[in-house]
């Protein structure tokens, strides 16, 4: 039962991260299309946001392995 809970936790975290990353990148591309001169600032902010979003599935995977 613990393996199933771990799989569900990792799967849901990955799903949420995928959706979050997609939204972050799409809004960044939209912003760059509107104001190309802000490309560097927008990309820097995007990378920080993606890193924060990706931290959640990593933490979920660690917790899931601890539950198993």
Curated annotation (Swiss-Prot):
PROSITE patterns: ATPASE_C
Transmembrane segments: 5-25, 47-67
GO MF: lipid binding; proton-transporting ATP synthase activity, rotational mechanism
Localization (cell): Cell membrane
Gene Ontology CC: plasma membrane; proton-transporting ATP synthase complex; proton-transporting two-sector ATPase complex, proton-transporting domain
SUPFAM superfamilies, A to Z: F1F0 ATP synthase subunit C (SSF81333)
This protein's UniProt keywords: ATP synthesis, Cell membrane, CF(0), Hydrogen ion transport, Ion transport, Lipid-binding, Membrane, Transmembrane, Transmembrane helix, Transport
InterPro entries (alphabetical): ATP_synth_csu_bac/chlpt (IPR005953), ATP_synth_F0_csu (IPR000454), ATP_synth_F0_csu_DDCD_BS (IPR020537), ATP_synth_F0_csu_sf (IPR038662), ATPase_proteolipid_c-like_dom (IPR002379), F/V-ATP_Csub_sf (IPR035921)
Function noted in UniProt: F(1)F(0) ATP synthase produces ATP from ADP in the presence of a proton or sodium gradient. F-type ATPases consist of two structural domains, F(1) containing the extramembraneous catalytic core and F(0) containing the membrane proton channel, linked together by a central stalk and a peripheral stalk. During catalysis, ATP synthesis in the catalytic domain of F(1) is coupled via a rotary mechanism of the central stalk subunits to proton translocation.
PANTHER family: ATP SYNTHASE LIPID-BINDING PROTEIN, MITOCHONDRIAL, ATPASE PROTEIN 9
The name this protein goes by in its record: ATP synthase subunit c
Species whose genome carries this gene: Oceanobacillus iheyensis (strain DSM 14371 / CIP 107618 / JCM 11309 / KCTC 3954 / HTE831)
């Amino acid at each position: 039962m613990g393996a199933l809970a771990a799989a569900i936790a990792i799967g849901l975290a990955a799903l949420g991260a995928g959706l979050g990353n997609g939204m972050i990148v799409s809004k960044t591309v939209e912003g760059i299309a509107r104001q190309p001169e802000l490309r560097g600032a927008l990309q820097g902010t995007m990378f920080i946001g993606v890193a924060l979003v990706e931290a959640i599935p990593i933490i979920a995977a660690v917790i899931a392995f601890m539950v198993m």
